[in-house]
Regions:
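Short, Lys/Arg-rich, polar N-terminal cytosolic tail immediately upstream
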Residues: 1-6
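Short amphipathic alpha-helical segments enriched in hydrophobics
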Residues: 30, 45-56
Length: 223
């Protein structure tokens, strides 16, 4: 662990908390939005714990996860579309609470919170299995194909997990309209997967054989 990495992680975490809080509670017009606090808790408490663990046990992996500068223009567009999707989803959820648009039952939101936490556990498992993971599409020096654990089920388990994470977010927030907005995520991530696989086939030794071995990209038995 380095001092620079610590302050970089702390700064991004703090900015994330403030930004998400503003996007949810400002449109809601109040801090008495229970679903908003529930979401903030299940998002940032596990994130903080995971960050501490990675800082001491896998600082290099944490450093890669904090680096989000895409080298490819096309992937930069994908990242921007994802960002717009999140902004719209959070703002609509807040507005929905403020103006009493259709809200999901509390029990459904609690179920969404459980699904979100399960996805977080799976997210941690993917990080444990694949130390080459970064937030940008690239092939790293001495990188090897991972074909065990969740990687033996689908070729992109990180995206599978984030799909569950992101689709459970609006459910936790109790917003049907926000859920409809985040349904655009599979379309966005499908484009990213296509570009990533083209790069991996070209630059990562053994990836073609891995594709033949593991048939599904994102969802078992579907795609």
């Amino acid at each position: 662990m380095t001092v620079k990495l610590f302050f970089n992680a702390l700064a991004k975490f703090t900015i994330g908390v403030i930004l998400v809080g503003l996007l949810i509670f400002l449109p809601a017009g109040t801090f008495s939005y229970f679903n908003g606090w529930l979401f903030m808790a299940i998002l940032f408490i596990p994130m903080f714990i995971a960050g501490i663990v990675m800082m001491f046990k896998k600082p290099l992996l944490l450093s890669k996860r904090l680096s989000a500068k895409e080298k490819q223009k096309e992937q930069g567009i994908v990242v921007k579309l994802s960002g717009l999707m999140f902004i719209a989803g959070f703002v609509v959820a807040g507005l929905g609470y403020r103006f009493s648009w259709y809200s999901l039952p509390t029990g459904v939101s609690i179920g969404g919170a459980v699904a979100f936490l399960v996805a977080y556990v799976l997210y941690a498992e993917v990080l444990r299995e694949n130390t080459y993971l970064s937030r940008t599409i690239e092939v790293q020096e001495n990188q090897k194909v991972i074909d065990t654990g969740l990687y033996s089920v689908v070729r992109h388990p990180m995206y599978s997990v984030t799909l569950l994470l992101f689709l459970s977010m609006p459910i936790v927030l109790g917003s049907l309209y926000s859920f409809i907005i985040l349904l655009s995520y599979p379309l966005i991530i499908a484009k990213r997967i296509k570009n990533e696989e083209e790069l991996l086939e070209k630059e990562l030794n053994g990836y073609r054989e891995y594709k033949q071995k593991v048939k599904y990209r994102l969802i078992p038995f579907i795609w």
